Amino acid sequence: MAYVFLGVLIILQQLDREVSGRVALADGLKGKKLLLVEDNALNRELAQEILKEAGFAVDTAEDGEIAVQKMKQAAPGQYDLILMDIQMPRMDGYEATRQIRALPDAAKAGIPIFAMTANAFEEDRQNALKAGMDGHIAKPLDIPHLLQVLTDVLK
């Protein structure tokens, strides 16, 4: 448990340095609402904390099935972007993306969806695109890269 705490502390210290060096990020993106879909509780908590520290509003789902339900029930414009894990119980990220893309509400169906996964081979990137995702962010997270991708997409 001490190792996990130390890891969280190191990540948050890195985040503090990254975010303080990117004040413009917070100004332009503060309050943007993300849906973070991640089955691993520790990964979910870490990513949520990183994103909140950067100024995002973050809602979470533990698997693809819950993510699809949240999108079906979401008010128009409730979410600006989805960060989707791939390997999850009940419904994986590929199937969840396909179901979100098939929603009758064009705004919900067209939301930017990025794979956020340890599956980092070119084949994995291509599978994400084929499923309808807009891009791929590899884990472990490179915080500056993650924040840059979010900035580029949400501006």
Listing of model-derived features with the role each one plays in the protein:
Residues M1-K155:
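C-terminal compact regulatory domains
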